[in-house]
Amino acid sequence: MTKYTSVNSSLPSLPRQTTPTRPATQTGRWDRMGMQTGNTPSSPLGFETKGSLNGSPTLRTTLDTSLSGTRSHPALRATRWMMGVNDIDSIQGDEDHPHDPGPDSDAKKRCASGKAPKDRPTSSVAVASTIRPPCCG
């Protein structure tokens, strides 16, 4: 018969923050993965377990830094577009990618001339190509 022990008992204890960023209103509970849930001041790993992505400057900085050097990969371009980080590529232009036209694209020329660009069919691969530039409304 095999004896199983708890994962938490075999791990070394991690130092906890001595001064929490905010007072805890509940004690919190441990979930199956060993992370503390509930309204707690900090997790055992030292970062906030509660909060949104946009409200956390640490996560936002990490994402901006990790995505800034990878302009040409299509999968990351789609991710950045959905997160709203793709604006710098539209300004600088990146003609090597069909779904991210540069400043000399036909859509922007038609937009400047007062005509709206033609709507293109939407597919899961070419979602970014159906978005109109900001000047077209």
Curated annotation (Swiss-Prot):
Residues 94-109 have a biased composition (Basic and acidic residues). Residues 15-27 have a biased composition (Low complexity). Signal peptide: none annotated. Pathway: Secondary metabolite biosynthesis. Residues 1-12, 51-71 have a biased composition (Polar residues). Residues 1-137 are annotated as: Disordered. Part of the gene cluster that mediates the biosynthesis of the tetramic acid Sch210972, a potential anti-HIV fungal natural product that contains a decalin core. The PKS module of cghG together with the enoylreductase cghC catalyze the formation of the polyketide unit which is then conjugated to 4-hydroxyl-4-methyl glutamate (HMG) by the condensation domain of the cghG NRPS module. One unique structural feature of Sch210972 is the tetramic acid motif proposed to be derived from the non-proteinogenic amino acid HMG, by a Dieckmann-type condensation catalyzed by the reductase domain of cghG. This is Sch210972 biosynthesis cluster protein E. The gene is cghE.
